[in-house]
């Protein structure tokens, strides 16, 4: 996952540089259908009196922008900002449903933050859970949130490997010769005695 830093300048309102120890992750939607991650980052940077910010923005195409360091407070959920890493997600759907690329990037980002700060899945929340605000709008619905929450907090299944056996020989010398032919063809090969 690539994270682009576009840190908001330190200031009184949207990046006070107050320290915070991450204990939970809060998912938001931008509330601006079709807006890009770049546009929101620019808004945060140029509107210091807006009193709004977030640590991360996930774009429609899955790009990730960091606006506030993880260990600083961002202003995104009224009085629930201390200890919270906020993630704004961009969207194209008028109902607020996230794009697949956004969900994939959100999954990577959330798993990274969970591992880095030892945050349990139960502490990955919606803005709605913190303050009652209808955000992210499409995912205020409990079933939709449960499905999204499962996707963004689930670790990928361990990759299974399958072994292909080629040949069985009664002579070790013949087995070694054949293994060498397989290696010359560009494949890994070894001889096992059974």
Protein language model regions, located:
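Residues that form or flank phosphate/diphosphate-binding pockets in enzymes
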Residues: 35, 97, 173
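N-terminal catalytic cores of peptidoglycan-degrading enzymes
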Residues: 1-78
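Solvent-exposed beta-strand motifs enriched in subsets of small alpha/beta binding domains
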Residues: 157-194
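Cell-envelope and extracellular/periplasmic
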Residues: 30-31, 80-94, 111
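Short, solvent-exposed loop/turn segments at the edges of secondary structure
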Residues: 20-22, 51, 80-84, 119, ...
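Short, well-ordered coil/turn elements that cap or connect secondary structure elements
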Residues: 51, 59, 119, 184-186
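Structural recognition of the beta-strand scaffold that forms the well-ordered cores
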Residues: 24-28, 54-58, 63-67, 84-89, ...
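Basic/polar, cationic surfaces and motifs that engage anionic cell-wall
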Residues: 1-8, 14-19, 92-160, 170, ...
């Amino acid at each position: 996952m690539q994270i682009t830093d576009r840190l908001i300048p330190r200031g009184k309102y949207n990046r006070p540089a107050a320290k915070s120890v991450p204990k939970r992750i809060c998912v938001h939607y931008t509330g601006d259908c079709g807006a890009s991650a770049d546009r929101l980052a620019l808004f945060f940077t140029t509107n210091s009196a807006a009193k709004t910010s977030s640590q991360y923005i996930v774009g429609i195409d899955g790009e990730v922008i960091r606006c506030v360091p993880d260990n600083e407070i961002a202003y995104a959920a009224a009085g629930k900002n201390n200890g919270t890493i906020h993630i704004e997600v961009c969207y194209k759907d008028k109902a607020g449903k996230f794009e697949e690329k956004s969900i994939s990037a959100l999954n990577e980002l959330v798993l990274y933050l969970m591992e880095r700060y030892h945050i349990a899945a139960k502490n990955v929340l919606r803005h709605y859970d913190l303050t009652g605000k209808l955000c992210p709008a499409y995912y205020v619905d409990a079933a939709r949130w449960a499905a999204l929450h499962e996707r963004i907090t689930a670790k990928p299944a361990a990759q299974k490997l399958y072994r292909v056996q080629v040949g069985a020989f009664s002579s070790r010398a013949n087995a070694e010769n054949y293994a060498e032919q397989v290696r010359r063809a560009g494949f890994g090969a070894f001889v096992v005695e059974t």
